[in-house]
Amino acid sequence: MMHLLADPETWVAIAFVILMGLFAYLGVHRMVLKALDHRADRIRDELAEAKRLKDEAAKVLADYKTRRASAEREAEEIVTSAKAEAERIAADAKAKMEDFVARRTKAAESKIALAEAQALADVRAAAAEAAVQAAATVLSQSVKGGLGDDLVAKGIAEVSRKLN
């Protein structure tokens, strides 16, 4: 047996057994198990939290996809509405412009016709005035005296009345 006590492995084994006994007496195994259980609980909680966060992220992603689709539809409706409104405004503007041009053309034609009529009346009046002056001159030179003056006055009045 002495021989066993001289062997260093024996002393290591004895120290190990004493250490394990001391650990058992002090309840180290319970502390280790408790720490392992605590770690397992923490890992389980972290896994549950990760699953919850994953589910929440999936819900948020689905919500954003729905919102995005809705926003795209709304934007498309706005663009369609804006195009229709622009076409309607363009058609209204074209109709108003055509109406304006037609009215301006008609007004210009009316002014031209009025100017033509006025010019014709002015020419007639000038011709009548010239004819009256010429007749007055001719009659006054050919007929002398009171009878001539009466005839000239009557003739001028009659010509003026007929020409105007």
Swiss-Prot record:
CDD domains the record matches: ATP-synt_Fo_b
Origin: domain of life: Bacteria
TM annotation in the entry: 8-28
InterPro entries: ATP_synth_b/b'su_bac/chlpt, ATP_synthase_B_chain
Entry GO terms, CC: plasma membrane; proton-transporting ATP synthase complex
Keywords, comma-separated and alphabetical: ATP synthesis, Cell inner membrane, Cell membrane, CF(0), Hydrogen ion transport, Ion transport, Membrane, Transmembrane, Transmembrane helix, Transport
One Pfam family it belongs to: ATP-synt_B
Topology relative to the membrane: Single-pass membrane protein
GO molecular function: proton-transporting ATP synthase activity, rotational mechanism; proton-transporting ATPase activity, rotational mechanism
Localisation: Cell inner membrane
Main location: membrane
Summary of the function given for this chain in its UniProt record: F(1)F(0) ATP synthase produces ATP from ADP in the presence of a proton or sodium gradient. F-type ATPases consist of two structural domains, F(1) containing the extramembraneous catalytic core and F(0) containing the membrane proton channel, linked together by a central stalk and a peripheral stalk. During catalysis, ATP synthesis in the catalytic domain of F(1) is coupled via a rotary mechanism of the central stalk subunits to proton translocation.
Family listed: Belongs to the ATPase B chain family.
Quaternary structure (record): F-type ATPases have 2 components, F(1) - the catalytic core - and F(0) - the membrane proton channel. F(1) has five subunits: alpha(3), beta(3), gamma(1), delta(1), epsilon(1). F(0) has three main subunits: a(1), b(2) and c(10-14). The alpha and beta chains form an alternating ring which encloses part of the gamma chain. F(1) is attached to F(0) by a central stalk formed by the gamma and epsilon chains, while a peripheral stalk is formed by the delta and b chains.
Entry protein name: ATP synthase subunit b 1
